[in-house]
Amino acid sequence: MTTPPSRLIQSLLLLVTFVVAGCATKDPYHTLGWKLENCAEPSASECGLSYFQEHPDYDLAFAEFTERGNAFNNQWIEDILDRIRARQREGGVVVVTFVHGWKHNAAETDPNLIDFKKALTVIGKGSETLRNRRLVGVYIGWRGASLDLPGVENLTFWDRKSVAEEVGAGGVTKLLLDLDQIDQKQRQNVLVVVGHSFGGAIVVSAVSEILTERAIGRDG
């Protein structure tokens, strides 16, 4: 005769099931390559899945990183940089790089991404300000939301803070260096880097790495 599980075991099983079911994906959200005018219809699935989106008033690139700070796919990052280089040669670029914060990710439904698109739309329609330069948004995605459960996600503060620091010290550093090199091609180019919440920690970590490398380079 089998003994029924105790209430403690039942509670633990229920808790584990609850948490596992609420875990956010560890996979990238944008996996399709660029196609000409792939976001002429923004609601199309092809647009939402693309890691380089060509909207009427701006381009939007997605650079997504693992919790270890590595790019999910280095070729995707190179494709993004190649597209930005091409835009730069056409007449200059204004690149706005945004790193989302804690409890957020690179999903098309994420509030940080939605607000970023709204901001790009407003800037992109100000053609007099851009002066024929192409506006390019770069959305740096990381697993800022490890749990999708309201309330429980607040428990991830210290864990996500640690991940943010590691992401900043990883591939984001190289990405910002590459964007800086593009920016220096013409005086009219502009590069802006913004981080929200723990996204700010990622920016600080990445910039610290860059400044350290440059200081060592001068001394050497």
Please provide the spans of the model-predicted regions.
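Histidine/cysteine- and/or acidic
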Residues: 192, 217-220
